[in-house]
Amino acid sequence: MPKMKTKSAAKKRFKITGTGKVKAAAAGKRHGMIKRSNKFIRDARGTMVLADADAKIVKQFLPNGL
């Protein structure tokens, strides 16, 4: 059986923590900030932990746990 390859797109966007959770940047901060509330902009700063269902999918793209 061939070696499992890591999806390059997932490698650039997600990180797996030591406890196995998946971290990602918050969405919706590329443009159009003028119509967003200040609370949204503050909350979208930094990274967030994905939900379990989403994390399960992302972990399939990262077989080596990058």
From Swiss-Prot:
MF GO annotations: structural constituent of ribosome
Keywords for this protein: Ribonucleoprotein, Ribosomal protein
Pfam family, one: Ribosomal_L35p
One biological process term in Gene Ontology: translation
Protein family per UniProt: Belongs to the bacterial ribosomal protein bL35 family.
Protein name: Large ribosomal subunit protein bL35
UniProt KW Ribosomal protein keyword: yes
The species this protein was found in: Brucella abortus (strain 2308)
Entry keyword annotation includes Metal-binding: no
InterPro entries referenced in this protein's UniProt entry, alphabetically: Ribosomal_bL35, Ribosomal_bL35-like, Ribosomal_bL35_CS, Ribosomal_bL35_sf
Chain segments annotated as coiled-coil in the UniProt record: none
